Design a protein with these regions (language model features):
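Bacterial N-terminal signal peptides that target proteins for export
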Residues: 4-15
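Bacterial N-terminal signal peptides
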Residues: 15-25
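N-terminal, post-signal-peptide metal-ligating segments of extracellular/periplasmic oxidoreductases
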Residues: 30-168, 174-176, 244, 248-300, ...
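Extracellular/periplasmic metallocenter environments
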Residues: 119-126, 137-220, 343-403, 485-489, ...
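Histidine- and aromatic-rich segments of cupredoxin/plastocyanin-like copper-binding domains
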Residues: 155-170, 234-418
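Low-complexity, Pro/Ser/Thr- and charge-rich linker/hinge segments at domain boundaries
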Residues: 215-230, 402-431, 578-590
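Active/binding-pocket-proximal capping segment
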Residues: 317-334, 484-520, 562-565, 574-579
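C-terminal substrate/ligand-recognition segments
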Residues: 425-430, 437-500, 523-558
Length: 619
């Protein structure tokens, strides 16, 4: 992975984008226009002292929260930036009342209306966007442009909703979103963050993200009814040592297990310093503190809101792994949404969480005899060209009495009745397959990353390009997503969830299949690295992609290691009504020269010291 740090991000992304634009033909982009334009919104003024951070070792507090009323949540955001004491650039969404990145609570069927002003300083021009466009920025994308993605939500990809390809809000401009949540949106944890191609990593590394909670989970899984809940936003940021060093895409990442990025919990840094004068270097960690009452069970709702960092969560009591009971993954209660009620929680002793994924589980307080209760993220080794992040603590659990916790007593609602409307994915597992596709991650490090479609020419993402895939509304497709590179990648699909049918060939690198996700409905899944052996198959996942919803239009799938997405590992999917699908696919077949052979065979992309490169074909 090896994403760059803040002082280098503009030059690195500019080089990558220039290479993309010089090698790609620009073709028409057709955006769905089924939206009602809002009136010109009033500007939201800047807020003093934006983007506050907390000292290492601080107590975790629940983020500020806003709740919908009468079916609507209306929010005003000022998007701002500042620098911290380590000269890191921070980004955040501030409300006029001074709330930073508040948690947004809605219910299925609600409207989320966000009026946002981009109050960051204008930066240089990045590229022109072909018409049609959305947002006041028109056709000019800059290094300070903004939009907002409502990650994991099954909402519309149209203008003023969850559209990220052509929505541009430049510095000084104001825009209004009106995001309609489906009436059968699964209750659970989602999140929001900027998604302008080329600069998504720097915004998320800077901290511009917040949680979205679709309330009502207690009526899908009564086991959480009335429990004390914790919204735990885990973010990453450049480490202090490497602010002035170049850590671009290169084999091996940081040496000797030094964390590639610092990790924060609720804006509390946990990685304070690495002493590089010692051999091997020694990193000092200062975990945050989370309070629990003795004997209680809490509902931990964890969002991996990092730009680039994979987590593997484990709760330890004096070094011994404890059982976590998984309630939901990626906003969907496990073993639900298929027309039946949940069959129970899934016990795990660790849970691997890709960037942008969410997990919600029950955690029990330690006995008073335990000396150290700690949530850690385990060692993450992501391949020859990836990172080697060591075991590191996130927070220590500290027992307190009930009075000390009164101010933090945020509880899930009480179970009232079984929610019979939560059947969004009913029948997906047995639906007829309209098409089978193979897509794969590929790269030429350090500046070219691809989300390839079998049978199509390889090209990095260009927002002006035609869709890579056209699908028909109302159908189900089966996709095999392969990894042809020497580092892990994370597959994300906008606007919908998919059913993870299988995880394939993970054992070639002695990787184990992550627990608790096969057979579940996800919007994120990790595909481990290939080992470079031409006799070995590519690791892959097999997915059922659910196009049966009402939404049509253009949206994207991509690697959610945002450094990779920014450098081209993304493509456009267009969903069209059934009447238009046949003509669209016929036209595309007439213009695309299909490659021969199956992608399950080695394609001759040979590993080198700088990545998987080459263009040789093997028979």
């Amino acid at each position: 992975m090896n994403g760059g740090n803040m002082p280098q991000v503009h030059s690195r992304i500019l080089v990558g984008l220039l290479m993309i634009l010089t090698m790609m033909p620009v073709s028409a982009f057709a955006q769905s226009t089924s939206f009602i334009a809002s009136s010109t919104p009033a500007r939201i003024p800047s807020v003093a002292n934006p983007c506050p951070r907390f000292a290492p070792g601080s107590v975790i507090h629940q983020p500020s929260a806003l709740f919908s009323q009468n079916g609507v949540l209306s929010v005003q955001f000022s998007y701002q930036s500042t620098t911290d004491s380590a000269n890191r650039t921070l980004y955040c969404f501030m409300t006029p009342a001074g709330l930073e990145n508040p948690t947004l609570h809605v219910r299925p069927g609600d409207h989320l209306i966000i009026t946002v002003t981009n109050n960051t300083q204008p930066l240089g021009f990045m590229m022109m966007l072909d018409a049609p466009n959305c947002g006041p920025g028109g056709n000019q994308m800059t290094f300070s442009s903004l939009n907002i993605h409502y990650h994991g939500t099954n909402t519309s990809p149209t203008c003023h909703s969850d559209e990220v390809i052509k929505t541009i809000i430049n510095s000084g401009e104001t825009f209004q979103y009106n995001v309609a949540f489906p009436s059968n949106e699964p209750p659970g944890l989602y999140w929001y963050h900027p998604h302008v191609h080329g600069i998504a990593e720097k915004a998320v590394l800077g901290g511009a993200s917040g949680a979205i909670v679709v309330d009502g989970i207690e009526n899908v899984q009564p086991a959480v009814s009335g429990l004390h809940q914790r919204i735990l936003m885990i973010r990453d940021q450049p480490t202090v040592q490497f602010q002035e060093q170049m850590l671009m895409e290169s084999p091996g990442g940081t040496p000797n297990g030094i964390p590639f990025q610092d990790v924060t919990v609720a804006n509390i840094s946990t990685n304070t310093m690495t002493d590089t004068t010692q051999n091997p270097p020694v990193t000092t960690y200062t975990p945050a503190i989370l309070h629990m009452e003795g004997g209680e069970t809490q509902f931990w709702r964890v969002s991996n809101s990092t730009a680039d960092t994979i987590l593997d969560l484990q709760l330890r009591f004096d070094g011994v792994a404890q059982t976590l009971r998984v309630v939901a993954v990626d906003g969907v209660v496990v073993n639900s949404q298929d027309g039946s009620q949940p069959s129970g929680l899934i016990p795990v002793t660790h849970f691997r969480l890709p960037p942008a994924s969410r997990v919600e589980f029950l955690a029990s307080a330690p006995p008073a005899s335990v000396k150290l209760a700690q949530l850690v993220t385990l060692n993450i080794l992501t391949g020859q060209n990836g990172d080697d992040d060591p075991n590191r603590p996130l927070f220590n659990v500290q027992l307190v009495n009930e009075d000390d916790e009164a101010a933090e007593d945020d509880r899930v609602g009480q179970f009232s009745s079984v929610n019979l409307n939560q059947k969004r994915f009913a029948g997906l597992a047995t639906a007829p397959i309209a098409a089978k596709r193979v897509v794969f991650f590929n790269e030429n490090q350090p500046t070219q990353f691809f989300m390839d479609v079998q049978g199509q020419p390889e090209q990095p993402f260009n927002p002006n390009a035609a869709p890579a895939i056209t699908a028909t509304q109302g159908t189900v497709e089966e996709w095999t997503v392969e990894n042809h590179t020497l580092e892990n990648h994370e597959f994300h699909f906008h606007q919908l969830h998919f059913l993870l049918e299988s995880q394939n060939n993970f054992g070639i690198n002695r990787d184990q299949e992550p627990p608790a996700i096969t057979g579940q409905y996800l919007d994120m899944v990790e595909v481990p690295n290939w080992d470079g052996n031409l006799d070995h198959p590519y690791p892959s996942v097999t997915l059922r992609i659910d196009f049966r919803g009402h939404d049509i239009g253009d949206f994207v799938s991509h690697c959610h290691i945002l450094n990779h997405e920014d450098l081209g590992m993304m493509n456009i999917i267009r969903v069209v009504p059934p009447a238009k699908s046949a003509n669209t696919n016929a036209a595309r077949k007439a213009t695309v020269s299909a490659k021969t052979g199956s992608s399950t065979k080695r394609s001759g992309l040979l590993p080198t010291s700088t990545g998987v490169m080459g263009n040789m074909k093997m028979n």
